[in-house]
Amino acid sequence: MRLAFWLYEGTALHGISRITNSMKGVHTVYHAPQGDDYITATYTMLERTPDFPGLSISVVRGRDLAQGVSRLPSTLQQVDHHYSPDLTVIAPSCSTALLQEDLNQLAAHSGVPSEKLLVYALNPFRVSENEAADGLFTELVKRYAVAQEKTPTPSVNLLGFTSLGFHLRANLTSLRRMLEALGIAVNVVAPWGSGIDDLAKLPAAWLNIAPYREIGATAAAYLDETCGMPAMYEAPIGVEPTTAWLRKLLDEINRIAGQKGLSRLAMPAPRAFSLDGLSAPSGVPWFARTADMESFSNKRAFVFGDATHTVALVKFLRDELGMQIIGAGTYLERHADWVRKELDGYLPGELMVTDRFQDVAKFIDDQMPDLVCGTQMERHSCRKLDVPCMVICPPTHIENHLLGYYPFFGFDGADVIADRVYLSCKLGLEKHLIDFFGDAGLEYEESDDAAKAEPDQPVSNAHGHTESKTVSQGEPIASDEGGISWSDEAETMLKKVPFFVRKKVRKNTEDFALGIGESCVTAEVFRKAKESLGG
């Protein structure tokens, strides 16, 4: 029944295809029933790249099963003949797991050389998107990385950047710009844009950069263990974390340079990291001290997402923008302990760990924060609740796969995040001003006069008779929640409250009324509630 609802993580195939679709000369054959190759539509809709997804399906049909035959060998032959990939990854499905088919034996009967095939054997019932992607990438690194001499000059690998990654290309551009300013070359970016030959060159770099907790960190740990390659796992999101990240990177590079007897690299002037090369690298430090942003110290924020972005955004909102964090959570249970450790001292209560979007929506509805940083799921939930929301991580939609330069990494990314926080919280004022001063003919909302002009609507009762439904002008209006009624005067006063906090004010006022034993919110009760709640 869970499939009837939205899910935060995709299937194992989703994770496998994110790796193979990122790479050159790598193809995926999915052994599954017809229709399970729907994932190709996701890439063509969101990825915005000229290449068609490298994914084919080996159809499992009832007739074939009855005859005791499989289409997998012939599908592998067709893929090898038509696409000529360097590697074909064979992915199991829930159907093949139930049928207990031996994919290795079926692949061996295809006649395709074994070195060009990889059966990624996992349990599709237990493994989901991120774990499958991280596991496959690590498997490929183990298979193809070859120990070799280091590059003569400082170089790094950028690991974990995958197809459908959040602001993928912009983040890569931001990292490349900072590395270029430091005088550090990029040896390999993987899996994005890499081939089998590139994976073989991974050990030539001086160190690995794996900023995503979800994908790439396991491969970096393997290279550290087997090839003695140090790794950096921090994500440079925010001004302070980026500054610390640059210092740590330079320290690591200079330590290795010292062992090699090479000259040390120096930290360039801050303006070297700016877009124009002349100004400060980020506007966040001064922007956070402006009158507009200082008012954010009273705003309450809730953050929910994957491990990497949840940790980064909580720290950015509190440390750099001064917002109050009322809660945070992640849908990745396997990384929950790491998130708890990183956010120790940042949260007023327990970390929310759930993969049910309904639980997150209920928390938002109960707390009514001033800003939600979450996924596409939270964007939908917040739209119903009139709560400002910005998307910070997958799952995403088309507006988070942009052609323009909107990174989250580095100093440039700090500016992008600050802009989105500010605009998400402030743009609602425009609608409030229209509500308050009138629409000036824009017809933004249905006017009260039009509502009053509507004729009484006939309502059919339980016996089939028609009655006229009227509400007298002075009769209190019952609230949908809790049975508390509101007088016309109190409703008029409530309409003067900005729409983006109106629901929260209504709820708090009704709670206050119940607390003092009132069953109807009058103008006097509304004023008392306002005074009591500090309004």
Curated annotation (Swiss-Prot):
Keyword DNA damage recorded: no
Chain spans, region Disordered: 447-483
Function according to Swiss-Prot or TrEMBL: Component of the dark-operative protochlorophyllide reductase (DPOR) that uses Mg-ATP and reduced ferredoxin to reduce ring D of protochlorophyllide (Pchlide) to form chlorophyllide a (Chlide). This reaction is light-independent. The NB-protein (BchN-BchB) is the catalytic component of the complex.
Reactions catalysed, as given in the entry: chlorophyllide a + oxidized 2[4Fe-4S]-[ferredoxin] + 2 ADP + 2 phosphate = protochlorophyllide a + reduced 2[4Fe-4S]-[ferredoxin] + 2 ATP + 2 H2O
Any GO molecular function: 4 iron, 4 sulfur cluster binding
NCBIfam families xrefs: DPOR_BchB (TIGR01278), PRK02910.1-3 (NF002789)
Keyword GTP-binding: no
Binding-site positions, substrate: G428, L429
Database matches in SUPFAM superfamilies: Helical backbone' metal receptor
Binding site for [4Fe-4S] cluster: D36
Pfam families listed in its UniProt record: Oxidored_nitro, PCP_red
Keyword list, A-Z: 4Fe-4S, ATP-binding, Bacteriochlorophyll biosynthesis, Chlorophyll biosynthesis, Iron, Iron-sulfur, Metal-binding, Nucleotide-binding, Oxidoreductase, Photosynthesis
Active-site residue numbers: D292
InterPro entries registered for this protein in UniProt: ChlB/BchB/BchZ (IPR050152), LI-POR_suB-like_C (IPR013580), Nase/OxRdtase_comp1 (IPR000510), P-CP_red_C (IPR042298), Protochl_reductB (IPR005969), Protochlorophyllide_Rdtase (IPR016209)
Subunit structure: Protochlorophyllide reductase is composed of three subunits; BchL, BchN and BchB. Forms a heterotetramer of two BchB and two BchN subunits.
Family: Belongs to the ChlB/BchB/BchZ family.
Listed pathway(s): Porphyrin-containing compound metabolism; bacteriochlorophyll biosynthesis (light-independent)
Gene Ontology BP term (one): light-independent bacteriochlorophyll biosynthetic process
Organism field: Chlorobium phaeobacteroides (strain DSM 266 / SMG 266 / 2430)
EC code(s) of this entry: 1.3.7.7
Class of enzymatic activity (EC top level): oxidoreductase
Name the UniProt record assigns to this protein: Light-independent protochlorophyllide reductase subunit B
Cited PANTHER family: LIGHT-INDEPENDENT PROTOCHLOROPHYLLIDE REDUCTASE SUBUNIT B
Entry cofactors: [4Fe-4S] cluster
Highest taxon of the lineage: Bacteria
Gene name of this polypeptide: bchB
